[in-house]
Amino acid sequence: MVEVFGIPIIAASKFADSGKLNHVASIMAELLDQDSDGCADDPNVLRNILIKSKGKVRPALVLPNKSVTKAASNAMKEKGFHYGQDLSFGEVLPKCSGLKFTTTCSDSSIEEQFHFITSFGHSRAYGQIFGTHWVDTSNLTKAMDIARYFLGFNFPY
């Protein structure tokens, strides 16, 4: 396990041995600190990511070999973490990141971590704008309804 700004990234040993854990951690750091000054660009987003759910556990980015098992999920809860987002070994392809991305070679590290930061950070910190729950009527969900042509229907996305 490593932490980036206090956010736990819990990884199977295969990740650490391959160097992929460092790749994922550096992307998390870049997403939260884009000006590279050593501080999260939006402390409100970081604070909300670090909030413990029900006062007991905090979300973690999980890097399993294949998928998160029930036993692994329970072990994380016992240590004070809960599964927030996963990123499997096969999805992390540093050789295919950035300008090396192609339609047949892509690294999912940015996308999956963006989901994590959005779900636990932006949507909590700025719910009126970035709320993502089914019952939210945030600017984001309204824009999603428009993009998916749900206007005039009582069926929000």
Description of each model-found segment:
Residues 4-156:
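Acidic/His-rich structured neighborhood in mature extracellular/periplasmic domains
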